[in-house]
Curated annotation (Swiss-Prot):
One of its GO terms (molecular function) is magnesium ion binding. Pfam families: RecU. It is found in: Cytoplasm. This is Holliday junction resolvase RecU. Its EC number is 3.1.21.10. SUPFAM superfamilies: Restriction endonuclease-like (SSF52980).
Length: 202
């Protein structure tokens, strides 16, 4: 039997829908990692053909591999081939979407040491090409998540090249609080739809 493209799409969507049903977890209350919650959210969007957003693979160069068993290989030495840019990218309603996700246990600020110059430069390039670029910032102790537009992150970074932590008051003033949900867990596309597609940031 020949699998034509539309059949392959249906198979993929069906597979993702099953995965999504198996991952019915409220990460804010059940200890699910922030990254896992975002991945589950992206699976939800994909399964319903709302958006196609994927986590970028990290480019790694394998240097040494051991074979403790013939059927199993163990990587014992590797290094990053190049600096990574942002965590996620994809397409939503014809718009390129690119974002980074960060998490902290602090209650009053997000450490800027987690952001690097090459990431800031990458976000600047995405904005120059009219892409939708932002960061999702999760305060695990407060159980609060914010969508901060890349413009606001870049402006704060440029003050002192990212040497100071970003106060949560700055994030609340310049960003958008993401309401936790069950399906999807981190509905960041709601922010884009309401504020960037025909909204104040358009």
């Amino acid at each position: 039997m020949v699998n034509y493209p539309h059949n392959l799409i249906r198979q993929k969507v069906s597979s993702v829908q099953k995965q999504t049903k198996q991952n019915k977890v409220d990460f804010a209350n059940r200890g699910m990692s922030f990254e896992a919650a975002i991945n589950a959210t992206n699976d939800y969007y994909l399964s319903r053909q709302i958006a196609v957003i994927h986590k970028k693979p990290t480019p790694v160069q394998i240097v040494k591999v051991d074979y403790p068993k013939r059927s199993r290989a163990k990587i014992v030495e590797a290094y990053f081939r190049q600096a990574s840019t942002t965590d996620y990218c994809g397409v939503y309603k014809g718009h390129y979407v690119d974002f980074e996700a960060k998490e902290t246990r602090q209650k009053t600020a997000m450490p800027m040491k987690n952001f690097h110059l090459h990431q800031i430069e990458h976000m600047t390039c995405v904005l120059h090409q009219k892409g939708i670029c932002f960061v999702l910032l999760h305060f695990s102790t407060l159980k609060e998540t914010y969508y901060l537009p890349a413009q606001a992150l870049i402006s704060f970074y440029q003050i002192d090249n990212g040497s100071k932590s970003m106060p949560i008051d700055y994030i609340r003033k310049n960003g958008f609080k993401v309401a936790f949900g069950a399906f999807p867990q981190v509905p960041y596309l709601n922010i884009i739809e309401q504020n960037f597609l025909g909204g104040d940031y358009n």
